[in-house]
């Protein structure tokens, strides 16, 4: 069986950028799939299963990121992660707004 390879560009829509809460959710999502997943910001690349790696991307609002998944579940994981970014992960933004 040939491994699937998926690549997609997304924009960070979270008001506070890609911070610890949404990063933790990305890491959680990747654990459910049999594939390698990385996220790149310019010349910085991160293993999406590692919180610290993702924090080092320093992805501010409106940053374009390149997502790449390789493996049997690459297509399924890519769909879930792209949906996560397209929604701006409202769940965390709404919680943040309560403290303002």
What kind of feature is each model-predicted range?
Residues 16-38, 44-63, 75-80:
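Amphipathic alpha-helical interaction surfaces in cytosolic regulatory modules
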Residues 61-98:
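C-terminal structural segments of small proteins and small subunits
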Residues 3-14:
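Short amphipathic
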Residues 1, 98-100:
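Intrinsically disordered, low-complexity non-transmembrane regions of multi-pass membrane transporters
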Residues 10-12, 39, 67:
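Preference for bulky hydrophobic residues occupying beta-strand positions
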Residues 1-3, 31-32:
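Acidic-glycine-rich active-site phosphate/pyrophosphate-binding loop
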Residues 13-15, 42, 70:
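Short strand-loop junctions, especially beta-strand C-caps/beta-turns
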Residues 35, 39, 54, 86-87, ...:
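Intrinsically disordered, low-complexity regions enriched in small/polar residues
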């Amino acid at each position: 069986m040939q491994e699937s390879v998926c690549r997609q560009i997304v924009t960070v829509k979270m008001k506070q950028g890609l911070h610890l809460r949404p990063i933790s959710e990305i890491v959680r999502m990747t654990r459910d799939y049999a594939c390698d997943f990385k996220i790149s910001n310019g010349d910085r690349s991160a293993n999406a299963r590692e919180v610290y790696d993702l924090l080092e991307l320093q992805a501010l609002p409106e940053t374009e990121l390149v997502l790449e998944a390789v493996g049997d579940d690459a297509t399924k994981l890519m769909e879930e992660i792209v949906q996560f970014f397209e929604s701006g992960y409202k769940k965390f933004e709404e919680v943040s707004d309560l403290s303002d």
